[in-house]
Structures are given as C-alpha cells and as structure tokens.
Regions:
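Residues at the starts of beta-strands that form the adenosine-phosphate
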Residues: 4, 34-37, 67
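Structural beta-sheet core signal
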Residues: 7, 38-40, 70
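A glycine-rich helix N-cap at a beta->alpha junction
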Residues: 52-81
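C-terminal structural segments of small proteins and small subunits
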Residues: 81-103
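Small/aliphatic-rich secondary-structure junction motif
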Residues: 29-47
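Histidine-anchored nucleotide/phosphate-binding helix
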Residues: 17-30
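Short, glycine-rich nucleotide/cofactor-binding loops
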Residues: 5-18, 42-49
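N-terminal glycine-rich FAD/FM-binding segment characteristic of electron-transfer flavoproteins
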Residues: 49-50, 60, 85-86, 90
C-alpha cells in the first residue's frame, strides 16, 4: 500500500504558507511519503504571486518533477491565474479533482 498526502496550502499568512511549501519540498526530496501532492488554494495563491521567496519555493518544488495544483476559481477571484500559470502551476477546478483523490 502506498503512502499519500495532499498538502493543501490555503492561508494568507506568509509563515503558514512557507511552512506548507517547506514540508512539501522536503517531504518530496526526502521521500517522506510515496506521493506528496501540493495544492494552492485561496489566498495562498495571491500571496505566492506577490512574494518572491514563496514563488521561489513553488519553483523549487516544481524542480522535483511533481506538479503544483492551483485552484482556478480562487486564482480567477484574486486575479492571479496567469501568474500561477507563468510560475508553472497546473491551474484547474480543484473541487472535483480533490474529491477524486480522497475516494
């Protein structure tokens, strides 16, 4: 049986976002689990788009070869969909996708 976790980062607090990204990066590099999925949701997308340290962490995670998922509805709401795509995130409607992961 494989071990899986979805790290869902949804805060507007930089420290909370940093911690979620840090865990996803280190956990993936050190193989804490078989599959670590990183999801950016809500206000975290807005702060990541505006913060070079956090966007750099997203790029570092992407360098592991794993995708970063960003919520399309939230990205559109905050006006950062293009920023998320430029960063390299897969911008998608996450509600049904996330539900499938947890089934």
């Amino acid at each position: 049986m494989s071990s899986q976790i979805a790290v869902i980062v949804s805060s507007s607090d930089k420290d909370v976002v940093w911690t979620g990204l840090f865990y996803a990066i280190k956990g993936t590099k050190k193989q804490f689990m078989d599959d670590i999925r990183l999801v950016l949701w809500g206000p975290s997308e807005k702060i990541i788009a505006a913060d070079s340290e956090l966007s750099g962490m997203v790029r570092e995670y992407l360098e592991t070869g794993k995708p970063v998922w960003a919520c399309r509805t939230c990205a559109d709401r905050y006006g950062v969909a293009r920023d998320m795509e430029t960063l390299g995130c897969t911008v998608a409607y996450m509600g049904s996708l996330t539900a499938e992961w947890f089934k």
